[in-house]
């Protein structure tokens, strides 16, 4: 293969807290979210080519488009219309699962294509999706606005996360439509100095989309109950617009044992929360 081939990693994006604080006149929702990344994700390989192509492989490839409907393809068209590249996406994250799989893939594609094509990634990546700028940033951050305002947060304490999806896809538009209000209070100022104080801070936050997502997919409530009952699970919540849920654990052993105790027909994985 060409020495110019790019191989990149697209880690899962997790909204540990997600407040919906308003709706703009153009229809976009204003968000305030603590976003982190987990040590599990998709992989993307890009090689120079005359024409643009996308091959989707991996254990979560079913149902993922391999054409212009895919955010990876859209990222290429947005960055440099008409340029060619052969892209292979190895899918490990659930499609439409609320953990930014498509956005993380698009961000990885932008980095790789910029390298292959020797171009810069311009501002405005939120045009591809609200989560794309934060996935380009790739570090723990407070995300506000329509995903375009990124603020630094205190260093995260070491922790592990168990991610669970019971096989449900929850359309983001339907979740927003089902919300009773979209003018909720913002996040409290991020402040913590260890795992326990971080959990205290999290308890003061919400996912404003969780209730409406559960009305669309009641199994989300079942997943959260199963997570809460696991030994060592210190905090549970739904990520993004659903339907992936998470549990936070202090140690790898606790997270691993918890993951092993969940139904085998669900998508379940455990990983460290990436601190930088």
Curated annotation (Swiss-Prot):
This protein's encoding gene? ispE
Top enzyme class, one word, equals transferase
Q: Which family does it belong to?
A: Belongs to the GHMP kinase family. IspE subfamily.
Which residues catalyse the reaction?
Answer: 13, 131
What are the top taxonomic ranks of the organism? Answer: Bacteria, Pseudomonadati, Pseudomonadota, Alphaproteobacteria, Rhodobacterales
Biological or metabolic pathway of the protein: Isoprenoid biosynthesis; isopentenyl diphosphate biosynthesis via DXP pathway; isopentenyl diphosphate from 1-deoxy-D-xylulose 5-phosphate: step 3/6
Does the keyword field hold Transferase? yes
Q: What does this protein do?
A: Catalyzes the phosphorylation of the position 2 hydroxy group of 4-diphosphocytidyl-2C-methyl-D-erythritol.
**Which reaction does this enzyme catalyse, per its entry?**
4-CDP-2-C-methyl-D-erythritol + ATP = 4-CDP-2-C-methyl-D-erythritol 2-phosphate + ADP + H(+)
Task: Name the chain's protein.
Answer: 4-diphosphocytidyl-2-C-methyl-D-erythritol kinase
- Tell me which stretches of the chain form a coiled coil: none
Residue numbers binding ATP: 94-104
Q: Among its keywords, does the record have Repressor? A: no
Could you state one GO biological process linked to this protein? Answer: terpenoid biosynthetic process
What keywords tag this UniProt record? ATP-binding, Isoprene biosynthesis, Kinase, Nucleotide-binding, Transferase
């Amino acid at each position: 293969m060409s020495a110019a081939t790019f191989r990149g990693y697209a880690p899962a994006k997790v909204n540990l807290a997600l407040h919906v604080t308003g709706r703009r006149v153009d229809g976009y929702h204003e968000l305030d979210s603590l976003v982190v990344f987990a040590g599990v994700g998709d992989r993307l390989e890009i090689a120079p080519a005359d024409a643009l192509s996308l091959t989707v492989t991996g254990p979560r490839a079913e149902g993922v488009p391999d054409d212009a409907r895919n955010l990876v393809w859209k990222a290429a068209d947005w960055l440099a219309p008409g340029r060619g590249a052969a892209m292979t996406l190895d899918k490990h994250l659930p499609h439409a699962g609320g953990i930014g799989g498509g956005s993380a893939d698009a961000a990885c594609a932008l980095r790789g294509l910029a390298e292959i094509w020797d171009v810069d990634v311009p501002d405005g990546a939120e045009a591809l999706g609200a989560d794309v700028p934060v996935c380009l940033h790739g570090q723990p951050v407070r995300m506000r606005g329509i995903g375009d305002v990124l603020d630094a947060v205190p260093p995260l304490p070491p922790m592990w996360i168990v991610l669970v999806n019971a096989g449900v896809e929850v359309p983001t538009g339907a979740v927003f439509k089902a919300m009773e209000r979209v003018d909720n209070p913002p996040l409290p100022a991020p402040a913590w100095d260890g795992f326990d104080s971080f959990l205290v801070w999290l308890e003061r936050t919400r996912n404003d989309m969780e209730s409406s997502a559960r009305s669309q997919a009641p199994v989300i409530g079942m997943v959260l109950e199963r997570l809460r009952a696991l030994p060592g699970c210190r905090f549970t919540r739904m990520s993004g617009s659903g339907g992936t849920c998470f549990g936070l654990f202090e140690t790898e052993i606790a997270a691993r044992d918890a993951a092993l105790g969940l139904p085998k027909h669900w998508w379940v994985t455990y990983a460290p929360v990436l601190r930088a």
